[in-house]
Every structure is written in structure tokens, then in C-alpha cells.
Amino acid sequence: MKSFDRRKDDEAYAAALENTPDQMASSHQMKRFFSKFIVVGNWIFRKILLELFIWRLHIEQPNIIILFGDTMVLDNDDAKVRESVEPTYKKKKGFQPLQLFWGPYLVDALFRAGSVHSNHGSDFMKAVGRLVNAIRNRYKDVPIILLTDSGFMDDQNFRFFEQRLKILYICGGKQYADLKEYVQQLTPQQFASYSNRQTAWNYVEFGNRLKSWNKFRRCIFSTLETEDDGQMKLEFVKTDTFIYTNIGIDNELTEKLIQAGGQHYVNVEEIIKLRHQCGKAELNHRSIKEFHGKEQLPFKREGMNRAYYYFLGISHLLYEAYKRDVAQDIIPENCYPTTFRRQLVDFAAKIVQTGNRFVLQVSAAIYHNLKIEKIWELSGSPPIALIQI
């Protein structure tokens, strides 16, 4: 918060925001501002994220929606007194919000204490159900695929997705002893191989029903043979993965997926590829943390930190939208915030006042390389989508 005091004394920073120094907020003003949110819960912020999600759907018009659900640990281990900073599974004290992504966009989040595990209560089912209902009521009835890791493997979740929501899912499975024993008894001839660029897997698929389940589900066992750089892995360090999915099992949902142009998702190889893309999806966590600059939240009160976290998430969604709507010809869509700042924010400029106007002056090289005129034009005319309220 002290950085606000430094910026308040920076006339150039104030001018860049089209403010005068006396209009800039101090650290005490920001603390008073966030204190207003102590009694404000998650719901109002989640409503804003949902509206932005619907806006992006109408802008990008996807025929198939792939959601990714996971928790993100915010390491606040240095905090001496901070509400809801509790031990996490990463053996660090902090917060552990539940997050749902569509591509790079954070479309829903539930701010939670650090000790609250992935599949706590019915949080995940309610969050997914809320998004699915919004998609169907305010966008269109398109196939939805949900990607999760083994922390969300639960028969209750699966039945909710299959029977209530009517969506497809790909979920990492837990490595139970009887399952591993079954796989070890299989012959090499029963395995098939799949490679994606330099990465290679051996896999086998079968129907599996755990003791507490009342139905069989499609299960795929894969073992990673080579790393992304093509390096072969020794037998004792190979990564084994179980995957559960209803793609190809639920005939009605699979047919809708094929009609929407997703016939390739029915293949075992594509399911393995999607499941292992969860690791890439987790790079969204890195992007959010890098966007913020650090993982520590600044306040002692949970309500103030909650508001701070949601403002960060909303800003990150708008940042991702800006890269695609305004800066797509200038900077890669998948660049991290540090690269974005270095190329599109941290460049030399001069602010001069002439008459009653402030003028931002840059060199000719920056003007042409960053296409300042085009950025200015697109920033002033953002894409508009007709959204049903």
C-alpha cells in the first residue's frame, strides 16, 4: 500500500492517468476504500466475473466450451496475523481460492482459506453448475467439456455432471493400489502409443468401477515415456496417470460434440492430450501471480483481502481481453504480464502541456513499431456484444 504514497508524489505518473497529483489516492485512502468491503462476500464479485465471461463468449463465439477447474495457493507464509491464512497442501500458509477458467480467462472464483481443500463440500459443483446454466441461458446450448485434476475425482461430482448438468468431463484419477496392480498385469501388446511432437505416452483404456460406484466409467491409463524435449524417462521415474471421462460413453452428449465439430475429442489420444493440457492451464495461475507482482495479499482482514483478490482477477480478465481485442497484432496472445509491461507499458515517452491539452510524445520508432495510432483507435472503440440480460 505504501507505493500509493510514492505515486501520489509522481507528477508524471499522475499525468499518464490524466490526473493531477492531488487527485491521486494515498495509502490511507486505499485502506479506507478496501475497509468498505469487509462485510461484502464473494457473490457480488463473482457476478462481475460472470458478466465479463458472457461478454467474451458473445465476442469470440465458441462452438465448444472447455472449462478448467483448480485451486490456486497464494503463499502468505510470512504473515504474522492475517485472517484465513492457514496451512495449505503445499506446506505453506496462505489462501487457496477455487478458480474456473475458460482459456486464459478467469470466469469464476471462490475466495477461501488455505486449509480448504479442492473438493470441499459442494463448492465445486455449485460453481460449475452456475457457469453451465449461464452459458445455456445467456449464450447458447453448446457442448461443454470440464477439465479437472484428481483432487476433484468424486462419484458425486461425476453423477452431477452426467445427470444434472449434462456436460462432458475429463478428470484425473487417483492411483489406487488395485488399479495399479491391474495395469501391471497387462501385457505390452495391450498398450498403444501416442506422441505429440517430442512427448510420447503409452496408454491403455478399459472400463472401471470403484467399490463405491454403481456404474462403470471409461478409464484411460497413460504413462509418460519422453519429456517435452524428447528426453526418454527411466522406468522408475515415469509419470503414470489415470483419466476418467464420459466422452464416448454418453451417446447423446458425444453426438452433440461431434455435430459441433469436436469429433477429434472422442479419440483416446485427444483425451490424453487434453488431460495433460491441465498443466498448461495451470500457467494461468502463474500469469495471475505475475500480473499482481507477488502472492502476498496486503491486509489483515479477510474481507479486505477478498476484495483485493477479486479486483486482481477482474483486472487480469480485462488484460487478457485487451491483448486479443487491441494488441493482437503487436504482442503474442500468450505472453506473460512481464513481457506485456516491458513492450507496451515501459517505453520512453514525454508528457507535455499545450493550451488546455496534455500530449504524450514518443519517438517515431516506438510510434510505428507499437502501432500507437491503431492501439489508440481500438482502445477507444472496444468490441460490443449484444447480450441478453
Positions of the model-derived regions?
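Short, positively charged, Gly/Tyr-enriched micro-motifs
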Residues: 1-48, 102-106, 136, 144-146, ...
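Short, conserved catalytic/metal-binding motifs centered on acidic residues
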Residues: 1-4, 21-22, 26, 30, ...
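Electropositive, glycine- and tryptophan-enriched low-complexity nucleic-acid-binding patches
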Residues: 87-139
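An anionic, glycine-rich sequence signature occurring as long contiguous blocks
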Residues: 168-283, 287-290, 381-389
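Domain-level cores of phosphate- or acyl-group-handling catalytic modules
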Residues: 119-178
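Short, solvent-exposed helix-loop connector elements
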Residues: 255-260, 264-275, 290-307, 323-335, ...
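A short, flexible helix-boundary coil/loop motif
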Residues: 318-389
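Active-site-proximal, Lys/Arg-enriched surface segment
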Residues: 21-23, 27-99
